[in-house]
Amino acid sequence: MINVVGSASRSFVFPADLPMVYAFYGDVGRLLNYLPHISLVRAYEPDRFRLLYSTTELGTYQIRIFADVQTTLDKGWVIRVHPLEGMPPVKAETGVNSSTAQGYFTSRSAFKEVGDHTRVEYSLQLRAQLPTPLGLRLMPGMVVDRIAASITHMRIREIVDGFIKRSVDAFPYWLAEMENHRSF
């Protein structure tokens, strides 16, 4: 088995006031689309989702990690995405150049007013136990684990940094959409 664990945290200032930023990030179903390498597979309910982390590593190995999550809007301007219990897990599978398993995805966004802007403290974690692809079984386990750890940390940084950029870039379009709905 390959142990996949990665986490990252970032703090950034969003160019809008706190209630507006909280409403924007509270639309989690939309925001999930801004996560690089992660796609929305299914919305069970407006606050419950199945996600898929999918990458091709070392130019050959297709890695797929499914995670069932729910969102919670907490007191104090906090949004949490955390594991959804009770869903049937995806069956772990492996091939010569592929591995699929159920994993866990969590994130936390805390919002704080900074003048006319909002500071966002964002953290994310992904973890899973992947069956070792057949093409990697001849390599020593410690070597595979080190490679997996290095790749996972790189991918998690890409996800967090990409999410921040994509969400900030998408905000004006969301704002225009909200204003159009108000005019009707």
Regions found by a protein language model. Give the residues of each.
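Hydrophobic ligand-binding cavity/cleft-lining segments
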Residues: 1-59
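Short structured motifs
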Residues: 7-8, 36, 52, 92-94, ...
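Short, surface-exposed coil-to-beta transition loops
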Residues: 7-9, 62-67, 102-107
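Solvent-exposed residues in well-ordered beta-strands and their adjoining turns
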Residues: 13-17, 54-56, 70-74, 112-114, ...
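Short, surface-exposed charged micro-motifs
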Residues: 40, 68-70, 108-112
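Glycine-rich portal/gate segments that line the openings of hydrophobic small-molecule binding cavities
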Residues: 44-95, 162
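Beta-strand/loop substructures that line and gate deep hydrophobic ligand-binding cavities in soluble
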Residues: 94-150
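A conserved amphipathic terminal alpha-helix motif
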Residues: 137-184
